[in-house]
Amino acid sequence: MDLDKVKTFYNNVAPQLRDLFGIFIKRCKEDNITISAGHLAYVTLLSLVPFIMVTFTIMSAFPAFASVRSKLEHFVFSNFVPTASDVVHKYMTDFVGNASQMSAIGILSLLVVALMLISNVDKTLNRIWRTQSDRPIVYTFAIYWMVITLGPMLIGSSVVVSSYLTGLAAFTEEYTPGLGTFLLSLVPSGAALLAFAILYMVVPNRRVYARHAFVGAIVATIAFEITKSGFALYVTNFPSYELIYGALAVVPILFLWVYLSWIIVLFGAEFTCSLGEAFENKKAEHAPRKVPKE
């Protein structure tokens, strides 16, 4: 009896999984996610310093986040930049310090560059979801401005929460050795998972089911953690970039990591979109059709 249930379950699920991965592979080829990731990586490096400067400027306007900056820098560079984090951190700090001395026109131009990154991410993800209608310009600008202003506040709040969890983990370590450290190690992955899910639900200009967004976010988070470990292992054991570029090795390493990160983001987006196309369309096909009354 149990064997019959397993066979029935397999016969029902296997075709859907086959359709899902078929749609996923087809979409990845059609959308050329590696090319889109390269474009986003270039725009990210161009917009990184302006975006960080705007983030820290907005956070400094709130006294509650005055002490968060150093914690935020440590959290980001230690968990999301697998190698050469100290060198990248130093360069970013110097760049942001130089940018903060610019005139009002210069700061405004940096703000435009930061908005350019958000705009490119928005357009790329909506192209993946095959969005037909564009948002009104006023509505689009309002969304971008909300990301610029509210984003730093949310980031600061998340860092405060992670600091609280660090203290809580240290407290639980006294009573349950190993448990606090294990739970604390899940914080970066949890932050990445939440960021992916929000990105896949909010950015597309169409409805995305939360369950699909979270499944896609789980896939992207697993891929991100595996890639981060593999990238760190490669750069540590095969330092060919340092032999070729010397002191400038951090530049291609950072670009390569940003490029791989965007591939993972688009990879998760394609998987999320494929879930909706495979399962929701299948439900629509099997839904009973209404017969018009005569």
From Swiss-Prot:
InterPro entries: UPF0761_bac (IPR023679), Virul_fac_BrkB (IPR017039). This is UPF0761 membrane protein MADE_1017605/MADE_1018330. It is found in: Cell inner membrane. It holds the Pfam family Virul_fac_BrkB. The chain crosses the membrane at residues 45-65, 99-119, 141-161, 182-202, 213-233, 247-267. It comes from the Bacteria. The keyword Transmembrane applies. Keywords: Cell inner membrane, Cell membrane, Membrane, Transmembrane, Transmembrane helix. Belongs to the UPF0761 family. The keyword RNA-binding does not apply. It is a multi-pass membrane protein. Signal peptide: none annotated. The lineage of its organism: Bacteria, Pseudomonadati, Pseudomonadota, Gammaproteobacteria, Alteromonadales. GO terms for cellular component: plasma membrane.
